[in-house]
Regions:
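Conserved glycine-rich cofactor-binding loop
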Residues: 11, 18-20
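Short, small/polar-rich loop/turn modules that mediate ligand/substrate recognition or access, typified
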Residues: 90, 181, 186, 222, ...
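Substrate-binding pocket helix/loop in short-chain dehydrogenase/reductase
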Residues: 105-106, 110-118, 200, 211
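Active-site helix of classical SDR
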Residues: 129, 165, 173
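Alpha-helical segment proximal to the catalytic Tyr-Lys
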Residues: 134, 178-182, 239
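Residue(s) in the substrate-gating loop at a strand-loop-helix junction
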Residues: 149
């Protein structure tokens, strides 16, 4: 009887994954049996990233490592992607989750606040996609999931920089999906609404009630809600889905 060859374990990189939505995504992909590279942007966040990587390895029996890289830097993004690829021997999934906000009305917004958001959210996505594309094209397989936002779809007062960055992510997603589809690489965007994270912890009870009243499901989303969607888009079952922007907002209307 011929011995069955065990399939090689897939490798995934999730940027901005030391906390919040990114953390939930990293855990979800590890639970699905993937080796996962956890990323944070600074040494200050490294202990949390290392703790998550250790938890992933201990709980799910997969390889995991934590790496510091500012994805706004093309050089650091390239090194990050290459390091994940080297560690796992392959790179099947890239989740561009790293993102920041610097909210303010346009009339009062500082140029550096506009640039900072664009650099991380939009340029960072481009940098990581560019680095991963070469690997995935050579493999003739891969999944790229970019984190957009409902704000990138509909806009929002006081978030012109954030909205522009997330709308740009949609543009990159649709363009890159056309470039990579012939090589069996899918590229999709996820557009979350209000999700329970550190960013929403600062909301007052009154603000929470106002937001919840605009959501058909009557509640803010959980990081795991987003992670479950990303896990599906990263799976073999999602091979015929590409170039899509999927809103996960509980039926919210901005």
């Amino acid at each position: 009887m011929t011995e069955q060859v065990k399939p090689e374990r897939k490798g995934a990189l999730v940027t901005g994954s030391s906390r919040g939505i990114g953390r939930a995504i990293a855990l979800s992909l590890a639970k699905a049996g993937m080796n996962v590279c956890v990323n944070c942007s600074s040494e200050r966040s490294l202990p949390a990233a290392q703790e998550l990587a250790a938890q992933i390895s201990a709980t799910y029996g997969v390889k995991s490592l934590a790496l510091v890289a500012n994805v706004a830097s093309a050089e650091e993004a390239q090194t990050l992607v290459e390091s994940a690829h080297t560690a796992f021997g392959r790179l099947d999934v890239l989740v561009n989750n790293a993102g920041i906000t610097r909210d303010g009305l346009v009339a009062r917004m500082k140029e550096e606040d506009f640039d900072a958001v664009i650099d991380v959210n939009l340029k960072g996505t481009f940098n990581c996609c560019k680095a991963a594309t070469k690997i995935m094209m050579k493999q003739r397989s891969g999944r790229i999931v970019n984190m957009s936002s409902v704000v990138g779809v509909a806009g929002n007062a006081g978030q012109a920089n954030y909205a522009a960055s997330k709308a740009g992510v949609i543009g990159i997603t649709k363009s890159l999906s056309r470039e990579l589809a012939p090589r069996n690489v899918t590229v999709n965007a996820v557009a979350p609404g209000f999700i329970e994270t550190d960013m929403t912890d600062a909301l007052s009870d009154k603000q929470r009630e106002a937001i919840s009243s605009r959501i058909a499901c009557g509640r803010l989303g959980q990081p795991e809600d987003v992670a479950n969607l990303v896990k599906f888009l990263a799976s073999d079952e999602a091979g015929y889905i590409t170039g899509q922007v999927i809103c996960i907002d509980g039926g919210m209307a901005l």
